[in-house]
């Protein structure tokens, strides 16, 4: 079964969930804020998504970080993401072992079938 990693208040996550439901695709959701983001789960995600692609530099959370935190991203990214799950790009759709679709735009899930 597919897993959709979301933050419930994210509009793009809602669109992704709706697209999967409309296609009749079975999936479970995992709310990164409510359900928590452990170091183990983050490592699991980063096995399928490059760290540079996982950090959402367009988020309010990113903009609110100090310049020092942004500059130390190479060494502290994992710790920052665990502290601030909204730094992780989302939604993340886990479609297979170590295979993730990052973000969502209309039509992204068309190839998944139903």
Question: Which residue stretches match the model-derived regions?
Answer:
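Local sequence-structure signature of Cys/Sec-based thiol-disulfide redox active-site neighborhoods
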Residues: 1-23, 27-32
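Thiol/selenol-based redox catalytic cores and closely related redox-interacting motifs
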Residues: 32-114
């Amino acid at each position: 079964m597919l897993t959709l990693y979301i933050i419930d208040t994210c509009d793009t996550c809602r669109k992704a969930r709706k697209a999967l439901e409309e296609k009749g695709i079975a999936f479970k959701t995992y709310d990164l804020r409510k359900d928590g983001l452990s170091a183990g789960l983050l490592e699991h995600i980063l096995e399928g998504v490059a760290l540079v692609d996982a950090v959402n530099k367009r988020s309010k959370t990113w903009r609110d970080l100090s310049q020092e935190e942004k500059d130390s991203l190479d060494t502290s990214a994992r710790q920052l993401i665990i502290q601030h799950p909204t730094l992780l790009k989302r939604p993340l759709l886990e479609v297979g072992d170590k295979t993730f679709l990052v973000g969502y735009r209309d039509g992204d899930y068309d190839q998944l079938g139903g």
